[in-house]
Curated annotation (Swiss-Prot):
SUPFAM superfamilies: NAD kinase/diacylglycerol kinase-like. Disulfide bonds: none annotated. Its EC number is 2.7.1.23. It comes from Pelotomaculum thermopropionicum (strain DSM 13744 / JCM 10971 / SI). It is an enzyme of class 2 (transferase). This is NAD kinase. Its main location: cytoplasm. Its cofactor is a divalent metal cation. The lineage of its organism: Bacteria, Bacillati, Bacillota, Clostridia, Eubacteriales.
Length: 291
């Protein structure tokens, strides 16, 4: 592995200095570094810039400098090529990023020496069907979320699993999540935590107006269909909280397991529950700080 695609979140503090150090280290160690043209120009490194398609085709590994959000975006972009991704964390505690800043160069040395393994994660595909025709197709790693806008009235959704009627929900929305997404929006809405090596789908209603509406765990090969019955205002489909599509009354959203899988480079055995505990404790401490 000696051709790296470097993806940089330019909004992170001191990212230009960190990126420069990483690029110099990789080049000194005989590696080639590629970046998106716009990012390369922003960092004063236009010589490294290539078109997006060339970046994905030529890079043997995508090295992401940012947080989990940047890693999610990159994982979706490269899923079709099967390019593995590894993240250097510049954000808060991350579930997906692998390397912390103090460990950057020892970790890169392990990577060059082949001391790593590939962890695959299930992804989701969502299609919007409007008047019998597919009008949008989206790919996600965490979740597909159907939700009303901030000022919209209660919405009504009819849900089917494998063409079998499940229920009609009066709710703020519905989350269909992967195991990776179980610790994201679904968790905040009362869904269960699922370890990421499993293949399954989670369905979590958002603020349902009935006490009996509860989260569900279903088989990974299930096909979930949500019919938008009515709603007073804007209703959106969002994937991973980053890519959205506006829905209309009578639209159908069909969610299934994607054919492609996200591929993450791991340098060490990950203790999922330690990371989970730290995240939950961090949220608790933040809540105390607002009292």
């Amino acid at each position: 592995m000696n051709v790296f695609g470097l993806v940089v979140n330019l909004n992170k503090k001191e990212v230009d200095e960190v990126a420069g150090q990483i690029i110099r280290w990789l080049e000194i160690n005989g590696c080639r570094v590629l970046m998106e043209e716009e990012t390369a120009r922003s960092l004063g490194l236009a010589r490294l810039g290539v078109p997006q398609r060339q970046l994905v085709e030529q890079a043997q590994c995508m090295l992401v400098l940012g947080g989990d959000g940047t890693l999610l975006r990159t994982a979706r972009r490269v899923a079709f090529s099967g390019t593995p991704v590894i993240g250097i964390n510049l954000g808060h505690l991350g579930f997906l990023t692998e390397i912390d800043i103090p460990d950057t160069f020892p970790s890169l040395r392990k990577l060059l020496d082949g001391q790593y393994y590939i962890e695959e994660r299930m992804m989701l595909e969502a299609r919007v069907i409007r008047q019998g025709a597919a009008v949008e197709k989206l790919l996600g790693l965490n979740d597909a979320v159907i939700t009303k806008g901030a000022f919209a009235r209660i919405s009504y959704f009819e849900m089917y699993v494998n063409d079998e009627y499940v229920n009609t929900y009066s709710a703020d929305g519905i989350i269909i999540a992967s195991p990776t997404g179980s610790t994201a929006y679904s968790l905040s809405a009362g869904g269960p935590v699922v370890t990421p090596e499993l293949d399954l789908m989670l369905i979590t209603p958002i603020c349902p107006h009935t006490l009996w509406a509860r989260p569900m765990v279903i088989a990974p090969d299930s096909v979930v269909r949500v019919d938008v019955l009515k709603g007073g205002g804007e209703i959106m489909l969002t994937m991973d909280g980053q890519h959205g599509f506006s829905l209309r009354r009578n639209d159908q959203v069909v969610v299934r397991r994607a054919e492609k899988r996200a591929r993450f480079i791991r340098l060490k055995s990950r203790d999922f529950f330690t990371v989970l505990r730290k995240k939950l404790e961090g949220n608790r401490d933040n809540a105390k700080g607002t009292e």
